[in-house]
UniProtKB/Swiss-Prot annotation:
Source organism of this protein record: Pectobacterium atrosepticum (strain SCRI 1043 / ATCC BAA-672) (Erwinia carotovora subsp. atroseptica)
Active site per the UniProt annotation: C269 (nucleophile), H353, E355
Residues reported in the UniProt entry to bind L-glutamine: S47, G241, G243, L270, Q273, N311, G313, F314
Pathway connected to this protein: Amino-acid biosynthesis; L-arginine biosynthesis; carbamoyl phosphate from bicarbonate: step 1/1; Pyrimidine metabolism; UMP biosynthesis via de novo pathway; (S)-dihydroorotate from bicarbonate: step 1/3
Protein name listed in UniProt: Carbamoyl phosphate synthase small chain
Lineage summary: Bacteria, Pseudomonadati, Pseudomonadota, Gammaproteobacteria, Enterobacterales
Protein family membership: Belongs to the CarA family.
Annotated region (CPSase), positions in chain: 1-189
A GO molecular-function descriptor: carbamoyl-phosphate synthase (glutamine-hydrolyzing) activity
Function: Small subunit of the glutamine-dependent carbamoyl phosphate synthetase (CPSase). CPSase catalyzes the formation of carbamoyl phosphate from the ammonia moiety of glutamine, carbonate, and phosphate donated by ATP, constituting the first step of 2 biosynthetic pathways, one leading to arginine and/or urea and the other to pyrimidine nucleotides. The small subunit (glutamine amidotransferase) binds and cleaves glutamine to supply the large subunit with the substrate ammonia.
EC number: 6.3.5.5
Subunit structure: Composed of two chains; the small (or glutamine) chain promotes the hydrolysis of glutamine to ammonia, which is used by the large (or ammonia) chain to synthesize carbamoyl phosphate. Tetramer of heterodimers (alpha,beta)4.
Top-rank taxon, per record: Bacteria
Length: 382
């Protein structure tokens, strides 16, 4: 039986459609993502915690869903907004339809609305709080009240909410078209020990580090630096994650300690912002944020352009950079800072997602730079 659904933004704009997920209510910051595919990876990206994701590509759900394409143990997005859900999901790897997947994970979603109109509204006014109600006779008054009551992501520390509860080891490399996910590698095949802070880490980041010879110990976001240093890591990885970086004082404090040791540090997304804050820079909330797999970024060191995957609502403020930081990458959309490198330490970071999943792989060599820093560090420590 087809159920109704309603999306109401905090400015009162209403979108009426049909429910394709669970019945109920979802409240969060409404953003749009321009990726043409990879909807399951987007939904399970912890960076989307407390956000309702609008996918601008009109046909979503064509290839169904499967367990291997998940980037975290559960769906992380608060809700989903799409234009059209195909009648049939067709792919040899599909285990269930997108609608079945959403219902099983208790995710509220709406289809059959004008996503072009919604996207243009968000582009002009900026990301807005919103509420989706799915079920019999959704109440617009209730939806508007819920949307207005949502506090927004500014000042919200979500890393400690989405992080792992316990440390764990990760030894699995990347998936290939030839088969299923590979078995975990032997530790003897992985010469570098990297501690990865989980602020909302995506699995493909871990896989790409393993591909480059790293055996990983993934630790909770609030793990003290002293506990990590006892593990004698060759490098420290700072993961992606949701929310505002400024309230994450525990992470900033730990990163400051690591910078004093000379251990190589590599940050992505939220980890990039945290490295900047630990180095004395500032961050700001963006009007729109960057969400999609087609964002051009200029590599200032090599004078080339990369097409990158992006997912962030905060940015490093270039006007407040200390002398110890230099800008390595800039967005060609809005000229915001996309990469930084310490001038005095083996530490660097990137705002986008070089692991893609979904998205292009132009920025994957950043992982290789991390390995180069690790090798230099190990050589100097002998």
């Amino acid at each position: 039986m087809i159920k109704s659904a309603l999306l109401v933004l905090e400015d009162g704009t209403q979108f009426h459609g049909r429910a394709i997920g669970a019945e109920g209510l979802a409240v969060g910051e409404v953003v749009f993502n321009t990726s043409m595919t990879g909807y399951q990876e987007i939904l399970t990206d912890p960076s989307y915690s407390r956000q309702i994701v609008t996918l601008t590509y009109p046909h979503i759900g064509n290839v169904g869903a499967n367990a291997n394409d998940e980037e975290s143990p559960s769906v992380q997005a608060q809700g989903l907004v799409i234009r059209d859900l195909p009648l049939i999901a067709s792919n040899y790897r599909s285990e269930e339809s997108l609608s079945e997947y959403l219902k099983r994970n208790n995710i509220v979603a709406i289809a059959d609305i004008d996503t072009r109109k919604l996207t243009r509204l968000l582009r002009e006014k900026g990301a807005q709080n919103g509420c989706i109600i799915a079920g019999d006779a959704p109440d617009a008054v209730v939806a508007l009240e819920k949307a207005k009551a949502f506090p927004g992501l500014k000042g919200m520390d979500l890393a400690k909410e989405v992080t792992t509860a316990e440390s764990y080891s990760w030894l699995q490399g990347s998936w290939t078209l030839e088969g299923e996910l590979p078995a975990a590698k032997n530790e003897s095949e992985l010469p570098y020990h990297v501690v990865a802070y989980d602020y909302g880490v995506k699995r493909n980041i871990l896989r790409m580090l393993v591909d480059r010879g790293c055996r990983l110990t993934v630790v909770p976001a609030q793990t003290p630096a002293e506990d990590v240093l006892k593990l004698n890591p060759d490098g420290i990885f700072l993961s992606n994650g949701p929310g505002d970086p400024e309230p994450c004082d525990y992470a900033i404090r730990a990163i400051k300690t690591f910078l004093e040791t000379g251990i190589p540090v590599f940050g992505i997304c939220l980890g990039h912002q945290l490295l900047a804050l630990a180095s004395g820079a500032k961050t700001t909330k963006m009007k729109l944020g960057h969400h999609g797999g087609n964002h051009p970024v200029k590599d200032l060191d090599n004078n080339c352009v990369m097409i990158t995957a992006q997912n962030h609502g905060f940015a490093v403020d270039e006007d407040n950079l200390p002398d110890t930081l230099r800008v390595t990458h800039k967005s060609l959309f809005d000229h915001t800072v996309q990469g930084i490198h310490r001038t005095d330490k083996p530490a660097f970071s990137f705002q986008g997602h070089p692991e893609a999943s979904p998205g292009p792989h132009d920025a994957a060599p950043l992982f290789d730079h991390f390995i180069d820093l690790i090798q230099t560090y190990r050589s100097s420590a002998k």
